[in-house]
Amino acid sequence: MKKSIAITDEIYQKVIEHIHVGMSEYEISALVQYYSIASGAQQMSFDTIVATGERTALPHGRPTSRKVKAHEPIMIDFGIQYQNYQSDMTRMCFIGEPDPKIKEIYDVVLKAQLAGLGAIKAGAKGKDVDKAARDVIEAAGYGEYFNHGLGHGLGIGEDGEGPTLNSKSETVLQEHMMMSCEPGVYVPGVGGVRIEDDVVIIDGVGVPLNKTTKDYII
C-alpha cells in the first residue's frame, strides 16, 4: 500500500511540472493517465477528476476542454492500482496567487483536514472523526457546502477496505485500518477546494502516508 501511495505522489509531481496557462483539463487528465501507467500502475483506481475555475465546485467534475487560467483553482483527484492496492489523493494547485475568496476556502479546508487527521485514532468512531473536520468548516460558515462524508476505506479491491467516515458511521476505528481524509467545500459560481490524504492507524494514531506538499502555487 505504501508503494502505491508513494508512486501516486511521484505522478502528481511530474504532472504539475507540465501544467501551464492554456492547457485543457483533458490534457491534464491525459498526463495523469500517462505517468500512472508509465510508473507501473495496473490501472487507475477510478475515473480521474480534473476541474478548473468555477468547475471545481463540482465534487466529482470530469475533465472537459476548458483551459487553465492564471490564479484560478485546479483540482486533481486520482488514484492508481499497484499490485492490487488502491491509492486516492486530491490536491489543489494554482498558477500564481489564488483569488482571495478561494484562498480563504483553501485555508478552511486545510484546517478541517488537519482536525480530521488528528481525530483518526484507534477506538474513535467514524462519525466523530467526520465531526472533527465538519465542525471547522461549519464554524467558518461553509457547512452547507461540505456535502459528502470525510472519508472511505482503502486497500485491496474496487471498494477498498476499512471504515467509512461520515456523520452516521458507527464504525470503531482499529489498528492498521486504512482510510482517506478528504474534506471539501464547493461553492457554486465561485469554486471548490478538496484536500485528500491516505491514512493508516499505527500505534493507535492516524498517520498520513502521502508526502505531496500542500503548498499550492506552481
Q: Where do the PLM segments sit?
A:
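Active-site neighborhoods and metal-handling regions in enzymes and metal-associated proteins
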Residues: K2-I218
